């Protein structure tokens, strides 16, 4: 059962991402409204996929990607960046930091589902052990 962490400061956007991915069989979703909250969640629970915005009020998406890639237990966690920043510099920076895919808003449900399916099929069963960490 894929565990997905959806991080965006917009509740509407988080709900839209969840609605787009809900048809993915047996997925379970956790939502975070900031980069700091995302990092807290990532230290508490194992996830199979991280869907992340770049623009957030405290810790930005790039910094969250850098945190994930700096952790041995999280290094293989697939990350989809979903952002309004469609410029090439943002795309390059996100991918260089370690994002798996970069998508711009607006996106279609099919494109997000396809990206998630592709990454989940390639990923190891869990990026972390099932046990919570302290």
Descriptions of predicted regions:
Residues 31-49:
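Acidic, metal-coordinating helix/loop segments flanking the phosphotransfer/catalytic sites
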Residues 57, 75, 87, 106:
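The feature encodes the CheY-like receiver
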Residues 107-116:
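C-terminal output helix
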Residues 46-48, 73-78:
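His-Asp phosphorelay/catalytic-motif detector in bacterial-type signaling
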Residues 11-30:
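Two-component/phosphorelay signaling modules centered on CheY-like receiver
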């Amino acid at each position: 059962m894929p565990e997905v962490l959806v991080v965006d400061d917009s509740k509407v956007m988080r709900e839209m991402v969840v609605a787009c991915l809900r048809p993915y069989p047996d997925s379970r979703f956790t939502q975070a409204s900031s980069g700091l909250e995302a990092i807290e969640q990532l230290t508490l629970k194992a996830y199979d996929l991280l869907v992340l915005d770049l623009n957030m009020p405290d810790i930005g998406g790039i910094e969250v990607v850098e945190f994930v890639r700096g952790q041995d237990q999280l290094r293989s966690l697939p990350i989809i960046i979903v952002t309004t920043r469609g410029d090439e510099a943002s795309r390059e920076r996100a991918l260089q930091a370690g994002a798996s895919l970069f998508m711009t808003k607006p996106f279609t449900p099919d494109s997000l589902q396809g990206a998630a399916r592709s990454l989940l099929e390639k990923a190891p069963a869990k990026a972390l052990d099932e046990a919570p960490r302290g």
